[in-house]
């Protein structure tokens, strides 16, 4: 059998870019199908409470929602998933944690069938937080996206009480301007639990906090390189993403480093805490998430 040709670095990059281009084209088609599904759902639910099917019920949702940013990592097979077959990985993850932050929807707009799979595979009470499609945040950058946001938010109608937050992550090149702040807040569906994560430090300012508080939009606090290291509270609930302190995704948090955030959250008086660990290297995320949850429960 002939050996596969070894691709150069440039060829591998071109191949990846081609895949991404195809995926982005598919996202447009999937968004159109979700749009039709949302309109049909709204026709059937015209007489229902407009907040029906909204994210997990505030009365029954646990106060601490702590988990990882994704669960299907091949490099966890020798750590978190040791001796567990791949088909059982989600079952194992959901037995250890009550929530997951899904990153895949950022790259691939979910189909209705995909969302139904999420529902089927999850145990009762398990909560999904969903990262919003790059079509909205990175390609269109909140320009002419009101309908797209509503269409993507239809996922919450499908998940019902298994829905947590929608996390909108903006790129590092997207720096603060008053116009961009207005674009974001005017395009969000404020019947949902919205979280916005910025990767440019200019967004850490009082004008942003004031506008977020007015709309009850959650400002995502970040533990990440070159970003302000502080907890920002703009709603009754707080949301923190742990990416790593000096290096993205590769930092193993010490107990002391986690405790700094526990104390900040405790001092904030937040009604609910959403915390997701994105430092997936070497399975650090699962270990750190468990330790963080233990500490924050102990602090109350």
How should each PLM-predicted stretch be described?
Residues 1-300:
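Residues lining hydrophobic/aromatic ligand-binding pockets adjacent to catalytic sites
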